[in-house]
Amino acid sequence: NWSNSNTFVEYNSNTNCSTVVLHRTAIATYDHKNEALKLNSGGYTTNTTKSRLNAILSEIFVGACVFQKNFNWFFNYNNQTHDFNDGMIITEGGVM
């Protein structure tokens, strides 16, 4: 269940996408057809946003995570680390 007081999931049957919303910000959108996940902090690089993104990632791409070092966010998957960028798209093959 991905719903609580400040986080919920919306499914759009027209696009076949599920979107996780935190405080009115779409932080992740999963395209079920293409098996791709779009990440977005909405400019809120907080522990809560990072925690929600990591919870989503752990369900879809095992071993993927967002982490912070020296106040900067990074994304790690398949032993590759990338700068975290709003709008980055993750697939089984890595970052697009």
Region locations from a protein language model:
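Terminal leader/tail segments of proteins
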Residues: N1-M96
